[in-house]
Amino acid sequence: MEYHLRTKLNGNIAMTSCFHENSFLQRDRSLYKFIWVRHGTLDVEVDHVVMHLEKEEMISLTPLHHVQIRGVGGEYLTFLFNSNFYCIYRHDSEVSCNGFLFNGSSRVMRLKLSPSQSARLDSIVDIFRGECGIQDNLQEEMLRIILKRFIITCTRIAREKFDVDPGREN
């Protein structure tokens, strides 16, 4: 699956299951990324450190992270966006581009998803896919809302994993 939207203000949002084959997205150093292994494994190099990700593991990366896919042993999904698409809008601090998932830490946020967490994210991805087929003047805003829902869901999962109280992420 491959979807990419560029807005009039140079905002970008993309979803792909073939990030390792898309040189355009790989070269774009402005993108925030979620990489989610759906089945099998994925070897990813982030800032010269190789990470072996397994089924239902997800990482969130900022534009400052240098990432290369080293080995694909299954199916994965990459959700990407830049600050012109999402971050220029006023968002609550915990779900912003400076929030809990993208707080600039040198450590990569790595999440292991439970079946119920995976199902919640699957439903958001399905909604995103459906919206990709609707070409109208509301699509950009709808995709922004879907992205925010994805980020909020991931933030809740990370809070639970790291036992962080709401509002205490920073």
Regions found by a protein language model. Give the residues of each.
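Conserved metal-binding segment of the jelly-roll/cupin
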Residues: 53-66, 80-81
